[in-house]
Amino acid sequence: MRMATPSSAPSVRNTEKRKNKKASSKASVSFGAPSPLSSESEDEINYMTPPEQEAQPGALAALHAEGPLAGLPVTRSDARVLIFNEWEERKKSDPWLRLDMSDKAIFRRYPHLRPKEDRPDAPSHAEDAMDAKEPVIGSILEQDDHKFYHYSVYIGGGLVMGVNNPSAAVCQATIDVEKLHLWWRPVWEPRHPLDSAELRKCVGMTVPYVATTVNCYQVCCWIVGIKDTWLKRAKISRDLPFYSPVQDWNVDPQEPFIPSKLRMVSDGILVALSAVIGRPIKNLLASVKPLNILNIVLSCDWTFSGIVNALILLAELFDIFWTPPDVTNWMISIFGEWQAEGPFDLALDVVPTLLGGIGMAFGLTSETIGRKLASTNSALKAAQEMGKFAIEVFKQIMAWIWPSEDPVPALLSNMEQAIIKNECQLENQLTAMLRDRNAGAEFLRSLDEEEQEVRKIAAKCGNSATTGTTNALLARISMARAAFEKARAEQTSRVRPVVIMVSGRPGIGKTCFCQNLAKRIAASLGDETSVGIIPRADVDHWDAYKGARVVLWDDFGMDNVVKDALRLQMLADTCPVTLNCDRIENKGKMFDSQVIIITTNQQTPVPLDYVNLEAVCRRIDFLVYAESPVVDDARARAPGDVNAVKAAMRPDYSHINFILAPQGGFDRQGNTPYGKGVTKIIGATALCARAVALVHERHDDFGLQNKVYDFDAGKITAFKAMAADAGIPWYKMAAIGCKAMGCTCVEEAMHLLKDYEVAPCQVIYNGATYNVSCIKGAPMVEKVKEPELPKTLVNCVRRIKEARLRCYCRMAADVITSILQAAGTAFSIYHQIEKRSRPSFYWDRGYTYRDGPGSFDIFEDDDDGWYHSEGKKGKNKKGRGRPGVFRTRGLTDEEYDEFKKRRESRGGKYSIDDYLADREREEELLERDEEEAIFGDGFGLKATRRSRKAERAKLGLVSGGDIRARKPIDWNVVGPSWADDDRQVDYGEKINFEAPVSIWSRVVQFGTGWGFWVSGHVFITAKHVAPPKGTEIFGRKPGDFTVTSSGDFLKYYFTSAVRPDIPAMVLENGCQEGVVASVLVKRASGEMLALAVRMGSQAAIKIGSAVVHGQTGMLLTGSNAKAQDLGTIPGDCGCPYVYKKGNTWVVIGVHVAATRSGNTVIAATHGEPTLEALEFQGPPMLPRPSGTYAGLPIADYGDAPPLSTKTMFWRTSPEKLPPGAWEPAYLGSKDERVDGPSLQQVMRDQLKPYSEPRGLLPPQEILDAVCDAIENRLENTLEPQKPWTFKKACESLDKNTSSGYPYHKQKSKDWTGSAFIGDLGDQATHANNMYEMGKSMRPIYTAALKDELVKPDKIYGKIKKRLLWGSDLGTMIRAARAFGPFCDALKETCIFNPIRVGMSMNEDGPFIFARHANFRYHMDADYTRWDSTQQRAILKRAGDIMVRLSPEPDLARVVMDDLLAPSLLDVGDYKIVVEEGLPSGCPCTTQLNSLAHWILTLCAMVEVTRVDPDIVMQESEFSFYGDDEVVSTNLELDMVKYTMALRRYGLLPTRADKEEGPLERRQTLQGISFLRRAIVGDQFGWYGRLDRASIDRQLLWTKGPNHQNPFETLPGHAQRPSQLMALLGEAAMHGEKYYRTVASRVSKEAAQSGIEMVVPRHRSVLRWVRFGTMDAETPQERSAVFVNEDE
């Protein structure tokens, strides 16, 4: 005999039952199902395993070796094994396939196993049957079923398959198999018999069934793969007569089923309904074209509805309305697989949504329904308990009368199936389990579970019949486990574990750190508890070893360092290691941990004279030296004091400094056996990330199989998976997929992927297996497995799935188009009826007419000279009435200056409205004087517009403009008449001023009074009850919140939510007079009082010696509130004032004072922050203005100088500018190039984005992790800096810029070369003293507009000019002293850190770009309005990093808080408060901006990829310079989600070419732009070249003194030769041709300007720019002759 080995699969074996015998010669007793492994009866001989098989434990099924039964199973158990094997293999391609291991299936598959007494005798019915030959398998049979014909597919053995029993004429039917029992005849036969097994795969599938279209014949066509329909039936041939179902090959057919009359009536109704939606009726309507006939009768009126009607009629005329294009194929392409199973699946998705909508419509929620069902639930539980009791009693009675069968044999049968599955898995997947640690562990775990279950059964049933079976099962489990362990012990290689050795002095916390590190690494590998230990010293027993992923080896070398080194060499190797164990069950245990963490006190891993020093050092992947100066200092100060040492240690191990030696190193200095390397500072997070990455890298290198893509199972799904793994974008994937549909072989399909990198993989196509890959544009295809035996019927199941989905899509499209067609038809008919029935008015016509003499046209203007049209009044797009204080009515800059002079002369009590009235009055007087001078006194005065309007109103005349302003329905009553209003007022209704509980919980005790939580971040209170400055509040330090005040109103803003349990409320600046609000008074005794207050006006009230600003109110509790205990008392200050505005509760202020009677109260309201830090000098200030400026609140009058109307740009030649050339920005209303608004209006347009709402913050946990990772990165790379002195801070400032507020002078005027003198000297000294004392100073910024070259669209189109912020000199000095050292440290590391401030494009650029080129993907983004979209919360997180890394953190914290507090910006007329956006103008602004850019980009990448920030930074390279960026990464980023994340943060990212849409990523660095330079590469490296447009602009324009006419020319100056030389260097990078063009223009300019300069050759300039030399000795191969040619 030969053996067959099935593959593995989970299954549950059905309990085997014996057939009932008609006659039995011998009585037998059975205790259930016979044992699968042994038999005690002759009747069950078919279940026995032959004796010769018991000696072969590896055999799973016995087959006949010779004779007529060769290759067939010996027993039924063997047959089950073979059936299981076949099912396991076919299940991979057909997951829906069911496992049938019953006796019926066995006898049908293997008839020789059927007992003789069970085989039918096949009675003869020759007298009733007309003999017919058995049809060919796969034939379509037409059967006479009374009123109609029924079709099915013959599959052999007298069985037919198809939709034999549909439940209704329109339903979801199931493909089934039944006996042939109707008169039949074959109407279609295949050329060759089809595979019956392949046909049977369709059994059990569901298909849509419609009696008139998708019926039994259509399903038969789907099964056999022919193209035909029931309406055509072109493939049917009716040459043969009908035959009787009783034949020799069809025994005992069943009686035909005759449906009832009710069933026939219901089927008729369903058929009629389906015919309405079906296409025949629509085709008939399309041929008649009823809408086209209607369109001939009626015409279009060219209204909106008429146009819609015309489009409908045109659609009908061109046959696209009633028969729209078939979109079934397009809908099918959306689905990756044909998996739609029918309306049931659709109902699972749609029904919950519909039920939810119905519940919402009726106001039902889960809470209300839960309350209603609570009582029902309790009653059901009681009834359930009673029912359980009754069932138990009933079971006992039934068991006494009819004993049940023993369930143990069924359990044993199930266990045998599971063991067969494991044995098959061991046989077929052994190599994969040995290579994959998780698969091997899962296999052993399943064996342990099965062994436990078998032992439970053996302990429960101790009879002899069960004991033999359980023992045999246990033996098979032990053999499987032993076979796996033996195979694992015989491996020739394994994954080498990662070794981390931490060396340092004792007692500094190394062991605790390593334990924590082990847990973190284990958690990163997927099992946090998988941490073990290695026995040390003389203990050499590994019984406690459980195969943990991470093991800890403490005190390496404590006893015998040479012995420990030998053990380390053995464990940290790829050769398998068998451990020494004492217990017999642990014999043969292997060491398979992935990470080994070692602690030691030695300075070197092993002695330097050790013979295998190099081998040991090579096996240590991370040699880390731990130092703790803090612990050493504590021990030195307090020897023997354990508490002092513990106090010096930190739970985050920040007291330990870790230094990473180079790989293979053996000491602290970085020496290796091959020379000296570089040591690095590393953190715990980075060490953990590197170790985990190395583990995964080695595991991937140790992998066994490539990915497999099965195109036979599903072409679309396999292609999508293959393209996604190759990194092909979705839009390119769709284009390649369309081309691949026409490919006939794998070679053609791989040729389409030649432009992409396809890793080696396997492809299954048409039964054959191919090894394919595409590396560096070379596709490779190798056939490794030929297809199996050819079959005439291929993938019939797939065809049915495809046809079924196509049918569903067609049905859905038919229903939708039927609804649209009905709606369109109704609309067209209604439109025509409504058009003919509505009345016609003369004003409906689009033309004017006159009836005769004296008639007038009401549509024409009455421009007859005696009146002027007033235009529309009321609110329009430009506002209501006359413009306010911030709309200058088109005033020029001179008129605006005149208005300011008049305001100053009148003491500030002069508005723009007054100025406009005075100007109009003066113009009228001037006109009158001129006319008197010309015509004399006798000439009548000319009527002004205002006088003419007054005269018309007096006479009762109406102008044409008034007539046109009227609406046609002015005389119609809108809404119901007042007489029909039946509403009534309930004068007895009681008004409840009590606030809900959720608002009362916001009132908390604070300081000496109370406070109120507006949101989780904002807390308000009265200023005089708050604790002193610098006090910790609600557990938060002063650095975690900002404080602003307005009078006695105090507001705290916390950076992180203190009360996340409460939603945000609306905080308003007081309310309108007459509003009734509630003051929520809380007392320490627990009393809560809600007092109604009618709010009055805003006022300043003197209470004692203090003046309180707020809103007054009158209590509605009576004349003497305090006497009745219904008023406020001392201690109630800080309680909130709230009122309900619509359905929303609003808080308007806090309680600060009350009169003695208690009837009048005062609420401090939320105004703008006071300017208490400002030191105003000079005469008394004017009353502080109120209102807003460009949406931003006004704080005070401004002092900034007027905006400049001059430019520093001059033309280099008088030639005309080329089209599209850039020009200096707009210069104001005097600009001769264009007639535009004032510069103040341009500035207001630039300020508006600062008042817009901000975006959302990144998730808190992601933001915290990103900030920690960035801080760790900077802390490990930046060198410690020394604080700057006052002199160095002054020297670092640019002396050619303005000093800002309050002097606004150039800094060089008061600079002696070493110090500031005069006014600026006093200001700088005062700021330096405030810094050194750690006191706060509020920065005051000055707004200006940048003078720069811009696109013509920003001058002649929509005028734009960039906004500049200039800080005062004091803020510059304080910021330079606080953050100057940090900025210098960043500049020194600009090549290694992502912040590139301070980089040189020609010197540092090649190194930076080379780092980017090491990664796979590259992207750059251009951000719109970067500064105005920034959030102060993100800037504060960036500022916290700068503060912690500055040399003086305590003093730097004060400066950073001042910089990030609400900014005070001087715009000339006013000082405004800006609470959001980036405040610029300080020495550290660029670094702060770049750091915030780094945080936002990293947060977006972490949120999209869900990868730890340290790993993201390890797999990526960033370059940030303000808002400019370049990002390179190896991670697979979803660019749509990445772009949406950035927009969710409030940013406005666009592509580099300013196109809208998701950001694009490239697989090459070529073409990425950074700092206006395109990154290109050649054989010598990467470099950045300036774009040609910038080079051309520098040839057209030069800088000089300010002037008004930008087109004036300036002769050559002293700096121009160096500028032109640098320009030649930039042009040399674009190739010799472009260099010659620029060189000729430079020579021409030099000749015209009298500049003496020599233009070098292109090659010399290129050497100078690229390699820093112009010598002729430069090697010829480095000249890059053919590299930089023009594109």
Curated annotation (Swiss-Prot):
Residues 342-518 are annotated as: Interaction with NS1-2, NS4 and homooligomerization. This is Genome polyprotein. The modification O-(5'-phospho-RNA)-tyrosine is found at residue 896. ATP binds at residues 504-511. Mg(2+) binds at residues 1420, 1422, 1524-1525, 1569. Residues 893-898 are annotated as: Acidic. Residues 476-641 form the SF3 helicase domain. Residues 595-700 are annotated as: Important for mitochondrion targeting. Changing residue 1422 to A: Almost complete loss of RNA-directed RNA polymerase. GO terms for molecular function: ATP binding; cysteine-type endopeptidase activity; metal ion binding; ribonucleoside triphosphate phosphatase activity; RNA binding; RNA helicase activity; RNA-directed RNA polymerase activity. Residues 117-341 are annotated as: Interaction with NTPase. InterPro entries: DNA/RNA_pol_sf, Helicase_SF3_ssDNA/RNA_vir, Helicase_SF3_ssRNA_vir, Norovirus_pept_C37, P-loop_NTPase, Peptidase_S1_PA, Peptidase_S1_PA_chymotrypsin, Rev_trsase/Diguanyl_cyclase. It comes from Norovirus (isolate Mouse/NoV/United States/MNV1/2002/GV) (MNV-1). Residues 1-116 are annotated as: Interaction with host MAP1LC3A/LC3. Residues 1-13 have a biased composition (Polar residues). One of its GO terms (biological process) is proteolysis. Residues 978-994 are annotated as: Interaction with host EIF4G.
